[in-house]
């Protein structure tokens, strides 16, 4: 699962860079949780459902 979480974090980091978006803004808009990206960076592994939700948000807002 760790490799999946790392890949997911990489996707999020790429989105942040491509859209020049602050991590806190992304966290609030995508998950309604201000510390979401910080928690990912800290090593928390999201559930498959959470990753699906965030990927859908990125697709709709990309």
Stretches found by the model and what they are:
Residues 1-17:
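A short, Lys/Arg-rich alpha-helix, primarily the initiator
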Residues 17, 31, 41-45:
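Residues in soluble alpha-helical coiled-coils and helical-bundle/repeat scaffolds
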Residues 59-62:
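Short C-terminal boundary/hinge segments that cap the last helix of small helical domains
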